[in-house]
């Protein structure tokens, strides 16, 4: 994995540092596997469901608005290059 070609900028987070690190690493791996936004979101969501128990939601794209309710300590919104990633647990 070549993380040097990815610029990550966390915009907002209510999540422990170790989970933020997992989120960014998982996202880089997903981008290494595919460039299809829906598939990237699915990879991240499934990994977090497995690692931190369901139910996680993930949105990946270049332009979107959002307003969500999330469980405490289970939210991150960050940019990776020209994409944005919203990952949160609810339900």
UniProtKB/Swiss-Prot annotation:
PROSITE patterns: DYNEIN_LIGHT_1. This is Dynein light chain, cytoplasmic. One of its GO terms (biological process) is microtubule-based process. GO terms for molecular function: dynein intermediate chain binding. Belongs to the dynein light chain family. It is found in: Cytoplasm, Cytoskeleton. SMART domains: Dynein_light. Keywords: Cytoplasm, Cytoskeleton, Dynein, Microtubule, Motor protein. Acts as a non-catalytic accessory component of a dynein complex. CDD domains: DLC-like_DYNLL1_DYNLL2. Pfam families: Dynein_light. It comes from the Eukaryota. Gene3D superfamilies: Protein Inhibitor Of Neuronal Nitric Oxide Synthase. The keyword Cell inner membrane does not apply. GO terms for cellular component: cytoplasm; cytoplasmic dynein complex; microtubule.
